[in-house]
């Protein structure tokens, strides 16, 4: 039987000149600047591990995990069906899978558990690759990683908590930490009236018995912006008679009862939606003082410094992924008789994007080398101002960098089912 003519023109056109998806590639092997930086900063021994990690990060299935984690936002319920207060945030399985991979590969732990030469550089490079898949879930990974220097200021608490914090496993269940082999740590500092001016905090800490470092307190007040509220414990700032102090507050009490740390709402954020951020109230939440009473900012600043380091590394990762997406598009798209990446003006734009991306990554890994060499006075002095400086500039630049990358891709880059809108 002969084929009937298409009288109704059901097939109107052939799809041509559309780039294929950037997937099933190796993020490490295609990043020559990263390879050079890893060698230069002293982590050449991690090449094979980073190559394997780069392969995982570039697979279509891995990239889809990031998409699914953001497409399916976290949900919150205050009570279970029997009326018990649960304060439970539920995440899509894709979020949990990304968390599992991160923690099983030691993104929160390796420089602390195996402080060999180049450990911070190798971990930063791995975090850089991981963040390009999906950035939001990296928040609790970073906070867990960054909590260690602050906890070490209170040795008895560190001895109790660090084995589970540093375990290379992930347990997302809403259970007391005593029933889990691994835990994650969050941070709760800001309040409504002060924001980053944490010395204006009004949350109060009342001693249960004796007062001072390592002692138990009950916290009463609120925190206005708490990300990853399902972490198993939080480093919290609260006022005592001696001033602002730092506390470790678990979500569950030692007797297995729920600590009265009550989530009020999830923030309806712009972007970064896979990472739940919340407002909470503390109604006598049990916590233990970390560090010297009245020196809470000085105590928690060790954690803040390491979160700043990860924030600039993650921001550099976002810039790298924006560059990769723009470059891939321009290599496979033609206009006015030539590939976009052959057009002189486009070549200038792509070169500018590459220079800024590589500069951000280079800075981050140089700081990682300083963190690896704290016995050297020059490196120790460098490691103090470098994270906040990098956190300011590198974290400030990605939106503008992403806008320029999206301008290379134009309209198709703005679709929410793609990775690119998450980079803005």
List each language-model region with its residue ranges.
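A glycine-biased, small/acidic residue-tolerant capping/turn segment at secondary-structure junctions
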Residues: 399-424
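Extended amphipathic alpha-helical segments enriched in small hydrophobics
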Residues: 308-374
